[in-house]
């Protein structure tokens, strides 16, 4: 079984040899076991709270690199040219701590008929879909990235 304990920094020197396609719920697990597209078992053991983002690369202990891809899953899509309505919907969904993908003219969340009814009640159209789900990291959530500035504590 392949094991990964960290993400790789992207770069042209990386030779990605395999990939895993996983849901958002699986990408937010700090410890998880999956089968790669080549049929190899992979276990990742990452820092708690770290969420794998579509396209990120895992560095395996044997020196190989595996790309993480977001799987299609059951989502609700909300599209509108009305920025105020979309902003209101994002506010109400965020107030319920719903993981939310925010894009130009759309919102996407994991399908939930109660949330769909709430968003419709705000005057928006909701469409059920199967698509990759890539929600925003929370404002207070660490991304696991590098700390690029220095603190002088003298």
UniProtKB/Swiss-Prot annotation:
The keyword Ligase does not apply. The keyword Chaperone applies. CDD domains: UreE. Pfam families: UreE_C, UreE_N. It is found in: Cytoplasm. Keywords: Chaperone, Cytoplasm, Nickel. GO terms for molecular function: nickel cation binding; unfolded protein binding. GO terms for biological process: protein folding; protein-containing complex assembly; urea metabolic process. One of its GO terms (cellular component) is cytoplasm. Its main location: cytoplasm. Residues 135-154 are annotated as: Disordered. Residues 144-154 have a biased composition (Basic residues). Involved in urease metallocenter assembly. Binds nickel. Probably functions as a nickel donor during metallocenter assembly. Belongs to the UreE family. NCBIfam families: PRK13261.1-1 (NF009751). This is Urease accessory protein UreE. It comes from Teredinibacter turnerae (strain ATCC 39867 / T7901). The gene is ureE.
């Amino acid at each position: 079984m392949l094991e990964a304990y960290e993400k790789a920094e992207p770069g042209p020197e990386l030779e990605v040899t395999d990939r895993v396609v996983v849901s958002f719920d699986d990408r937010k697990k700090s410890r998880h076991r999956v089968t790669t597209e080549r049929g190899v078992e992979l276990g990742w053991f990452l820092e708690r709270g770290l969420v794998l983002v579509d396209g990120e690369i895992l560095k395996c202990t044997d020196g190989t690199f595996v790309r993480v891809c977001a799987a299609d899953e059951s989502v609700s899509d909300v599209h509108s040219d009305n920025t105020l309505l979309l902003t209101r919907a994002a506010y109400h969904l965020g107030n319920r701590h719903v993981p939310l993908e925010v894009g130009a003219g759309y919102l996407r969340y994991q399908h939930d008929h109660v949330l769909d009814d709430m968003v419709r009640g705000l005057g928006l159209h909701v469409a059920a879909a199967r698509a990759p789900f890539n929600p925003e990291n929370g404002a207070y959530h660490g991304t696991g990235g590098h700390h690029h500035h220095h603190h002088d504590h003298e």
